[in-house]
Amino acid sequence: LALFLTGVAQQHAQLLQGERPLHLRLSSYVLCLARAPDRELLKLCARFWQQWATFLSRSFPRAGGGAAPEGEYSLLTQQVIELLTQRMPRPEEVMMMENEDGEVVRVESRDTDGIALYKSMRESFVLLAALDYEITEAILMHALDLQVVFLSLSPL
């Protein structure tokens, strides 16, 4: 379903962007699919969100005194920012290991799939954050608050 919806969105982007209710409904479906705990689904949806964020940043330019997305686009933008905040993978793993000489060295493990997903989601996040930085700040502060509460409740 995600492959079909994102494929239709990519092939008919101009038509969908002209039909706001249809574009919002399709975007809502992709948002629901992106919440599934499947990494392949997330990759498909991340490409869609990258195109969607580009469309919104062109439609609602902030730097030129334009307005942030309002109404349903604003709600969907907020939900996508929350999803990106929750599901964005770490860029790469860095571990400290002892080599054969007994020295502690830094070892980076490469996850090319994860790096590509991270870059795609990061670009979407940056574009959406530029559109409505107040909502983005509130979402990030809430996520940090949850981490602090979790750390304070976990035993040392």
What function would you assign to each model-found segment?
Residues 1-32, 121:
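Non-catalytic protein-protein interaction scaffold segments in large eukaryotic complex-forming proteins
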Residues 28, 35-156:
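Alpha-helical repeat/alpha-solenoid scaffolds of the HEAT/ARM/MIF4G superfamily
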